[in-house]
Amino acid sequence: MQTSPLLESLMEALRCLPGVGPRSAQRMAFQLLQRNRSGGMRLAQALTQAMSEIGHCSDCRTFTEQDVCAICSNPRRQQNGLVCVVESPADIHAIEQTGQFAGRYFVLMGHLSPLDGIGPDDIGLGRLEERLQVESFNEVILATNPTVEGDATANYIAELCAQHGVMASRIAHGVPVGGELEMVDGTTLSHSLAGRQPFRF
């Protein structure tokens, strides 16, 4: 079946999004063209503007239109000496939604993966070490993902912190709230048992 080259191009472009296959891309393209052309134009404008204007914060490497993001430039965030290391800007968003952290961040944009050729310099650890040398941190909280690569990355950064006399901690991993023990995998359950907390009255 022959279709418009522009339509094919649109569907192919939509497939760059995570979880979008050929059928999903086709549905999206037809939806925009049939029922929501104004929404499609807004999407195109927002994408164009975001791709051309959003860069990385010079301090923490998250996404921002400014040289330094709003979190890093907030004096109250600078005072407590806490830095949370995460793998992606999406992790910042998740932590901010909890309302439990009032420090600053450092975004790795990935994790160490020697098999994929990703070393310390590829995830900005040189920049993090510079900050450890010149800034006064009370604690570095390692919030990398609970994967083999995430744990290896956290261990590497913890060693860097130790070399500079900065305390490093790892976020707790364990049974999710509302979860049932029989459904939890063995590794997660092991972490939960090792990180158990006493009752305080």
From Swiss-Prot:
NCBIfam families: recR (TIGR00615). The keyword Transmembrane helix does not apply. Keywords: DNA damage, DNA recombination, DNA repair, Metal-binding, Zinc, Zinc-finger. The keyword Kinase does not apply. Residues 81-176 form the Toprim domain. SUPFAM superfamilies: Recombination protein RecR. PROSITE patterns: RECR, TOPRIM. InterPro entries: DNA_Rcmb_RecR (IPR000093), Rcmb_RecR (IPR023627), Rcmb_RecR_Znf (IPR015967), TOPRIM_dom (IPR006171), TOPRIM_RecR (IPR034137). This is Recombination protein RecR. It comes from Pectobacterium atrosepticum (strain SCRI 1043 / ATCC BAA-672). GO terms for biological process: DNA recombination; DNA repair. GO terms for molecular function: DNA binding; zinc ion binding. A zinc finger (C4-type) spans 57-72. May play a role in DNA repair. It seems to be involved in an RecBC-independent recombinational process of DNA repair. It may act with RecF and RecO. Transmembrane segments: none annotated. Belongs to the RecR family.
